[in-house]
């Protein structure tokens, strides 16, 4: 006897799956923690995939925004067909529908059903410009309707997230600029936020190139920002094209005892041949010579501007509105035998005794990188450099401890290969402005890194009971392997421990350089500027209660 298997065209298995011609059809939904940004065309809020190897006819997609702080913050909802692209880069997909959001649901309908198979989709939103930074967005797929069957709900559903609101402060293409990199952030004595960054005009790579230092100001806690200003631009100095007069890696320092604000930058004039160690000659706008201050012979011993990178400082005395002509302090802070002395990007500090301190970095006589500090004890009139704290380290930031000493938190090149429990930031302290350094107990064992710039910052606040408290904050890509998972961490014991209970994940995607800079906005709020997955310069404000700190007075 011959047995015949009858294959039904459609079998309903559940609200999550059905069989069509013997093949199971289902929907996977995925959410990630990334910020939803103001002043940007759209930001992804969820991804879903329809699992079926043959063509299906989609009639309707229902998206819900239950749990969103205020639906009226969302102006437009977009649906992108990403094809087989599983990334979260919606601009690489095909926009198939968009509509204004009037309630907690967005319904995308297709009069001519879309024929799809195994496709990824992204739902994205555009925020209104007046969306408060303390709001959040939450989204999910309610159901998808097919011509062939009843509606389906997702069978694999990633954990629901509340996406924080941020600002797309700088995006590639803004003001005709190719790329913005290297954030710094500070609060002035007038409670103005100053954000600074590399303005990489022609291409995205590091020095040497046509790069200036840009500044953005905010007087409302980061909700809105004034147009970009340029703080450091060496133009066509020495009759060389701007591509051979780049300034990069800026650091900002607010003098807490005066109206002075300083920005330091690394200036390269011309370019040195990486093979011969000699300055290139006859450079023109069409010359393709390139080298970088950290590469072989990128910067040489001595002080000649044609041979060694220069340490520049500019000053503002009007709350960051205008910036003075640059002052070259290379001869004050660089040892003649060093190949390089340069600012470390981010922000500097004012010590309790009024000393101004920049985190700095360099290369010694053997071209081995090091970290150190550069300081002024006379209100910025003159500057001195401390001795190297540790070798084979570079970018760093500093905080003052309660005993008056300085803690330096450093990017360590050893971590390129060290992925064991010994992976961690290099940490040293000094009690005498870098004359001598001591290894800290958390050296190489507390804060993991993928070898990347990071930020450490001391925030002092008043409690509900009127007491003063200080906490340390740290931000970096929280990974040993990739520049992903931008995270803020808190220490209540001056950097000895960083309990995971007080970590806040801001952006888990690894689509950026991963640099960051922290500052205070007010008693109860922290600001961060970082290189994020959704904008080259992303700004967010963070309330202390979001970090698990609930005893701060509200402003």
Please give the residue ranges for each predicted region.
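Asp-box/BNR beta-propeller blade signature and adjacent active/binding-site loops
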Residues: 42, 56, 84, 92-105, ...
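Short alpha-helical "patches" and their helix-cap loops
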Residues: 9, 139-141, 361
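Compositionally biased, intrinsically disordered low-complexity segments
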Residues: 7, 14-15, 30, 402, ...
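Bacterial Sec-dependent N-terminal signal peptides
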Residues: 1-23
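Exposed, polar/acidic Ser/Thr-rich sequence context and nearby capping/turn residues
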Residues: 23-163
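Local alpha-helix boundary/kink/capping signal
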Residues: 15, 72-74, 322, 365
């Amino acid at each position: 006897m011959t047995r015949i298997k009858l294959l039904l065209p459609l079998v309903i298995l559940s609200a999550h799956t059905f069989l069509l011609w013997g093949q199971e059809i289902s929907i996977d939904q995925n959410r990630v923690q990334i910020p939803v940004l103001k002043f940007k065309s759209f930001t992804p809020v969820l991804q879903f995939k329809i699992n079926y190897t043959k063509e299906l006819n989609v009639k309707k997609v229902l998206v819900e925004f239950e749990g969103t702080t205020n639906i009226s913050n969302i102006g437009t909802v977009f649906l992108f067909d990403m094809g087989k692209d599983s990334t979260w880069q919606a601009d690489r997909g095909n926009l198939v529908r968009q509509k204004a959001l009037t309630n907690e649901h967005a319904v995308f309908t297709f009069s001519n059903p879309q024929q799809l198979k195994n496709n990824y989709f992204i739902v994205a939103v555009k925020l209104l410009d007046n969306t408060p930074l303390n709001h959040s967005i939450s989204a999910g797929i309610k159901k998808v309707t097919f011509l062939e069957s009843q509606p389906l709900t997702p069978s694999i559903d990633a954990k629901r997230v509340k996406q924080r609101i941020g600002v797309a402060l700088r995006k590639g293409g803004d003001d005709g600029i190719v790329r913005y990199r290297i954030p710094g952030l500070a609060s002035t004595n007038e409670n103005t936020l100053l954000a600074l960054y590399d303005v990489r005009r022609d291409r995205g790579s590091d020095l040497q190139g046509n790069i200036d230092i840009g500044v953005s100001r905010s007087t409302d806690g980061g909700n809105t920002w004034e147009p970009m200003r340029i703080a450091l631009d060496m133009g066509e100095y020495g009759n060389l094209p701007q591509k051979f007069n780049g300034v990069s890696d800026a650091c900002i320092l607010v003098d807490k005892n005066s109206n002075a604000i300083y920005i330091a930058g690394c200036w390269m004039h011309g370019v040195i041949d990486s093979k011969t160690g000699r300055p290139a000659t006859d450079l023109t706008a069409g010359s393709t010579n390139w080298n970088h201050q950290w590469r072989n012979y990128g910067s040489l011993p001595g002080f000649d501007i044609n041979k060694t990178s220069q340490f520049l400082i500019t000053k503002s005395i009007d709350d960051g509105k205008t910036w003075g002509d640059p002052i070259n302090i290379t001869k004050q802070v660089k040892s003649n035998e060093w190949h390089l002395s340069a600012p470390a990007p981010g922000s500097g500090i004012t010590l309790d005794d009024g000393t101004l301190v920049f985190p700095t970095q360099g290369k010694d006589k053997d071209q081995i990188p090091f970290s150190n500090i550069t300081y002024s004890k006379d209100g910025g009139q003159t500057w001195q450099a401390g001795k190297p704290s540790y070798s084979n380290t570079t970018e760093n930031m500093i905080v003052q401890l309660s005993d008056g000493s300085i803690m330096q938190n450093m990017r360590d090149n050893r971590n390129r290969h060290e992925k064991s429990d010994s992976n961690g930031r290099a940490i040293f302290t000094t009690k005498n402005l870098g004359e001598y350094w001591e290894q800290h107990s958390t050296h190489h064992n507390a804060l993991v890194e993928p070898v990347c710039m990071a930020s450490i910052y001391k925030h002092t606040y008043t409690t509900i009971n009127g007491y003063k408290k200080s906490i340390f904050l740290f931000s970096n890509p929280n990974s040993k392997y990739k520049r992903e998972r931008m995270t803020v961490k808190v220490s209540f014991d001056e950097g000895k421990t960083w309990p995971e209970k007080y970590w806040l994940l801001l952006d888990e995607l690894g689509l950026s350089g991963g640099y960051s800079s922290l500052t205070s906005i007010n008693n109860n709020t922290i600001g961060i500027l970082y290189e994020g997955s959704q904008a080259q310069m992303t700004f967010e404000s963070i309330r202390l209660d979001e970090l698990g700190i609930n005893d701060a007075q509200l402003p």
